[in-house]
Amino acid sequence: MLCMMAVVSIKAAEQPNVKLTVGNNAVQVQIDGRPFTTYHFVGEAASPFVRPYFYPILAADGTPLTSDQMITNPKEHPHHRSMWVGMGSVNGLDHWSFQQKPAPPPQRHVRFESVGADSLVEDLVWEDLAAKPLLTEKRTIGFLAYPDGSRSIDLTIALTAAGQDVTLGDTKEAGLCAIRVSSQISRKPTLMNSRGGKGEKQVWGKPADWVDESGTIDGKPFGVAIFDAPTNLRYPTPWHAREYGLLAPNEFGLHVFDPKLPGGAGDMKIANGRTITFRYRAVFHPGDAAAANIDQKYGAFVKGLDK
């Protein structure tokens, strides 16, 4: 049975002109009359589909800021489909990666509960290999823009155990708000976090409010950041963040990130019928983290959580 828990969208002070066009397979998103992203919620026959994803994600000037590896380099992390929600161990089943055989368990779109001026509320089911529900999800997606040309996607993810207890397992392969940045950005990247960590050794597996990766695309500076909400369990989250371009908050991989902890230390159990909720914001910005005032944007994000 689908969880009907009310979820409040994360709002910001900015009120861009957002237009959502819902089709049979995807939602087209425009900001101020220019394309921002496409949210693919149902697969098409020509492309393998396991879970919904956002692609492309464009800067205000039209520059693509993310990579869909299924299209650009399917031999390397084909499950990195620009921006997606994934979890590598759901009662032991892999809802993160992609393999041809056996077919991976899907996240299945059920319906859009509502479509607003700048947001969507979507019902989904995370299934097992027999197409039985493990989790129901209510996913709230919000879109906004900043005066400096940055654009953002908000995710509120409410997961409910459906018919049995569900354990989200201690694994490296997880990110309820995961992004693969453009390969141009990751050629000479600056990867950093809110605590002053720079480079993969100081960012991967380390707790932080936010992580940002920036670089250049065709000679122009751009970056991508993800914000973790203080309301999330295990805040501030450790991060599965790599200089090759992956950004993902990972509240679950505690033993993976710190082998001194016992195996399974990061397991998170959801009792049958219970719900846990996570909130994130992804910011797609011109310039590096400092130029984009990511710290200030994070502060505004936190203040907006109660609105």
Language model: regions and residue ranges:
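Bacterial N-terminal signal peptides
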Residues: 1-7
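Sec/Tat signal peptide C-region and signal peptidase I cleavage site
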Residues: 8-12
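Beta-strand-rich N-terminal accessory domains
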Residues: 13-77, 156, 230, 289, ...
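Acidic, contiguous internal or C-terminal segments within carbohydrate-active enzymes
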Residues: 16, 20-23, 122-171
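Acidic (Asp/Glu-rich), glycine- and aromatic
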Residues: 39-42, 49-56, 146-193
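Extended, loop-rich substrate-binding clefts of extracytoplasmic carbohydrate-active enzymes
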Residues: 79-149
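Active-site/ligand-binding surface loops and adjacent short beta/alpha elements
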Residues: 165-167, 171-238
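Beta-strand-rich recognition/accessory modules
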Residues: 227-307
